[in-house]
């Protein structure tokens, strides 16, 4: 069966979907609260900085409605971009506590792979720390490019894609692969990068990134068993359970 449809069937089952309820609720709350206060705070700062009473070229330029509209639109786009992906990251982080259970259920249901020694918590935290260390300079570079239209969006897009891809892959592979197999994965296969890019684009839409996090995880779990361990799902077990 196609991995997409197999993942979609699992995604719609309550035994899996229940794990996404808490992460979706917290991520949505963060998006609404932080998004509102971030936009209004930055707008208030810009209005105060470019207030008409102050003298200077930038204050004069900001007094034009067209210029004010462009700056506030950029503010909305960048803040919206940041809040959407940050809320998705928080949702993904919460869901990561349930990913080992999700992977174990999928393995028991379809693949019957005998798990060996898993990654330890310390080793997993070290891998996450390495990802964050590489993400920080990318994020600061994006901040430097903040006031360059369109370039700022591309910079933030690439920086957060790096974090999204690596965090999602780490979350899934650490739950699926044993310690030895994990260390052998020096490079992520192109097929994984392609799908995480598609997931990242979907996550750029408000709410979609929150609701579909569980699907992303389930899909990559199936992909890992089939493309790394080269296992085929036992569909007879699947058919008998439906």
Residue ranges and their predicted role:
Residues 1-8, 49-62, 89-125, 166-186, ...:
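Membrane-interface segments at transmembrane-helix boundaries
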Residues 7-25, 115-142, 168-173, 177-203:
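Interfacial aromatic "cap" segments that immediately flank transmembrane helices
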Residues 187-242:
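Long hydrophobic alpha-helical segments typical of transmembrane helices together
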Residues 73-104, 146-175, 207-231:
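Selective recognition of hydrophobic, aromatic-rich stretches within alpha-helical transmembrane segments
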Residues 19-42:
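Hydrophobic alpha-helical transmembrane segments of multi-pass membrane transport/permease proteins
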Residues 31, 72, 203-207:
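Membrane-embedded alpha-helical bundles that form the substrate/pore pathway
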Residues 38-81, 117-138:
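Long, highly hydrophobic alpha-helical transmembrane signal-anchor segments
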Residues 19-20, 68, 72, 76, ...:
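Residue-level signature of transmembrane alpha-helical entry/exit and packing/kink sites
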